[in-house]
Amino acid sequence: AGLPGSCARRCGALVAGPRLARMRIALAQIRSGTDPAANLQLVGKYAGEAATAGAQLVVFPEATMCRLGVPLRQVAEPVDGPWANGVRRIATEAGITVIAGMFTPTGDGRVTNTLIAAGPGTPNQPDAHYHKIHLYDAFGFTESRTVAPGREPVVVVVDGVRVGLTVCYDIRFPALYTELARRGAQLIAVCASWGSGPGKLEQWTLLARARALDSMSYVAAAGQADPGDARTGVGASSAAPTGVGGSLVASPLGEVVVSAGTQPQLLVADIDVDNVAAARDRIAVLRNQTDFVQIDKAQSRG
């Protein structure tokens, strides 16, 4: 009761006892178009709804600025450009931290697939960005033709909670998630425009739950809504990943706390970050982890 009609809410719990470190988060499962200004209006709308619902953080999908499948150099802007500054303004006005996907230009003619994380305040706190590390050269799509990779994992602090940033295909690489956990992340956001196809939605759900278990963290997986047959327009690519819905929050034990269908929706969930330390102490996979030398770089003694 008391949440907007478009919201779904469920509280996740791993251990009994008093609630000491609760955080309310929201996932905005939107359907981005090709007009960055119109998409920025969507950010404002959903950020306002999330703030009204009492959320401290709202996570938007990859490609919030402009959907994939169209030329991106034409819309790319620097992280201090008008679109990113619009996100910062929304965060300040709504009093909520916003994580959203955008594209930034590079010197080699490509773009970076970027997340901006902007909190309320003047100056904004946090105010950071992450460039997608693992590029989607799979399933008949070659992201690296138009997108340059990032190099560095990023963790930001939102109301005392350490939040790791990842984008879409990153979710298939467990080492990034365990590294974010090593750097202190208690919650990891993955912002996606997931590709459609047989079994892909099931893979998305499974991967989010698996990365939560790998990192012993909450995972907030925000995806683009399923566009249906709306993927048309000059320069559109039918192979481009443009969303399947299925946004979810997974607990450090891999439980689904809350999940969405395929259509645009705002999810709201309460998480207890004390559960992260409890899970890491109980299962101890991070503490017991062993690092291996890459076999192709090892010198043979035989």
Question: Where would I find each of the regions flagged by the language model?
Answer:
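Cys-nucleophile CN-hydrolase/nitrilase-fold catalytic domain and related Cys-dependent amidase chemistry
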Residues: 33-36, 44-123, 129, 195-217
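CN hydrolase (nitrilase-like) catalytic-core segments centered on the catalytic cysteine
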Residues: 80-99, 171-265
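Active-site catalytic loop in hydrolytic enzyme cores
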Residues: 89, 106-183, 187, 195-210, ...
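Extreme N-terminal starter segment of soluble prokaryotic enzymes
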Residues: 21-26
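Short beta-strand scaffold segments in enzyme catalytic cores
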Residues: 101-102, 113-117, 154, 247-249, ...
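A conserved C-terminal secondary-structure "cap"
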Residues: 276-302
